[in-house]
């Protein structure tokens, strides 16, 4: 339980698109997008494993579309930047192994219904959404700024600003909080893969000059003299990506969401179409939580939605302000149930989730980035919530 009073520290991490687990996530979502572009009703559960010189694709897919899996895999790896055997992973030469089956008929009969509105949930489980007023995008400050650093690491590598970085990297930001509010950045950790010829001094200078200062100085939370900065603290990070660690789809679920602030139901997102409530339910929960905060009903909101496989209506819904709202949680929950239809078909329709948009979600967070495709980041329901709550 995060305290609401006194001084404490909270930390969140992010990784770059070259991190092996994120390579896997991007491949899984690339396969999903290729199929949705041809058949919006594709049922996709695509898992990826990447290791030295190899990618393995497995899962269950039912679709009228076609995906050239070796091409999809290699294009994804090329776009990330693994273009040399020296990195242990080269898009031109890596092996691609696939084992794809159709969706289980037993699962399909629980999802498919005579009328679309009665579409059942694709699985049981609980999903969480979270929002707070710590940043303009209504995300917790630690994960928001950690993602900003990771994105910057990739940006300066790809645009040529820094020529010694390689694709793999991680960032971490620790905030000091006082009475539940972020007041300053206490420490920053950055690890970036680099060329063998790069010196530690050059790496530290490049990270501070081109990554940390441009991102964190405008934040209002960063004073370099009062902040501990840790950069490549092993002294060497040449071996990275899938050569350094095996990567798997769905192993970065905390940095995909809220950086540990708020709960997580355990289900991963990448490689799954919208009939999987692990993904669509979590997106809807974020949409609800963000609209509650945007409405002014609470400065902090967490939403839990739970489903039973084959059943359209959720088995439970909880909306909590964690004691920050002027109205009871019961009132918030009732308002949410009045404004939002939480059956899977209606979630998919409201958020327009049958589009090939998921490649953009697979790195730097599924939430808190207000891209045109990210409908779950819209705050168009805020006024309706205020009306339903009668405030």
Swiss-Prot record:
Q: Where, in this chain's numbering, is K(+) bound? A: 47
List, in alphabetical order, the GO biological process terms annotated in this UniProt record: one-carbon metabolic process; S-adenosylmethionine biosynthetic process
Drop me one GO molecular function for this one: ATP binding
Task: Give the main EC class.
Answer: transferase
Give the cofactor note text: Binds 2 divalent ions per subunit.
Main location (coarse class):
cytoplasm
Q: Which NCBIfam families match?
A: metK
The similarity annotation says:
Belongs to the AdoMet synthase family.
Q: What is this protein called?
A: S-adenosylmethionine synthase
């Amino acid at each position: 339980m995060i305290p609401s009073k006194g001084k404490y520290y909270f930390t969140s991490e992010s990784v770059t698109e070259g991190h092996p687990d994120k390579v896997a996530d991007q491949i899984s979502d690339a396969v999903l997008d290729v199929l949705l572009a041809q058949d919006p009703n594709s049922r996709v559960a695509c898992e990826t494993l990447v290791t030295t010189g190899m990618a393995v694709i497995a899962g269950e897919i039912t679709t009228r579309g076609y995906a050239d899996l070796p091409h999809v895999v290699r294009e994804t790896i090329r776009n990330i930047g693994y273009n040399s055997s020296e990195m242990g992973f080269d898009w031109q030469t890596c092996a691609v192994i696939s084992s794809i089956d159709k969706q289980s008929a037993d699962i399909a009969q629980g999802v498919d219904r005579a009328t679309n509105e009665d579409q059942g949930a694709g699985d049981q489980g609980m999903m969480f959404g979270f929002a707070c007023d710590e940043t303009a995008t209504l995300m917790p400050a630690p994960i928001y700024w950690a993602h900003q650093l990771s994105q910057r690491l990739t940006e300066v590598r790809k645009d040529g600003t820094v020529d010694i970085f390689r694709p793999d990297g991680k960032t971490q930001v620790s905030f000091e909080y006082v009475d539940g509010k972020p007041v300053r950045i206490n420490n920053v950790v950055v690890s970036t893969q680099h060329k063998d010829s790069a010196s530690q001094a050059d790496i530290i200078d490049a990270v501070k000059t081109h990554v940390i200062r441009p991102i964190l100085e405008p934040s209002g939370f960063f004073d370099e003299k009062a902040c501990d900065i840790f950069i490549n603290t092993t002294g060497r990070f040449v071996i990275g990506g899938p050569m350094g660690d095996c990567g798997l789809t769905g192993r970065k679920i905390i940095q995909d969401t809220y950086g540990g602030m708020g709960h997580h139901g355990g289900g991963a997102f990448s490689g799954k179409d919208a009939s999987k409530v692990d993904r669509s339910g979590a997106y809807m929960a974020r949409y609800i939580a963000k609209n509650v905060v945007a409405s002014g009903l609470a400065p902090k909101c967490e939403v839990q939605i739970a489903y039973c496989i084959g059943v359209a209506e959720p088995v439970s819904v909880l909306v909590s302000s964690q004691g920050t709202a002027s109205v009871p949680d019961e009132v918030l929950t009732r308002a949410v149930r009045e404004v939002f239809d939480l059956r899977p078909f209606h979630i998919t329709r409201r958020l327009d989730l049958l589009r090939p948009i998921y490649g953009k979600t697979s790195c730097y967070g599924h939430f808190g980035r207000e891209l045109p495709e990210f409908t779950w980041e819209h705050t168009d329901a805020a006024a309706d919530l205020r009306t339903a709550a009668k405030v």
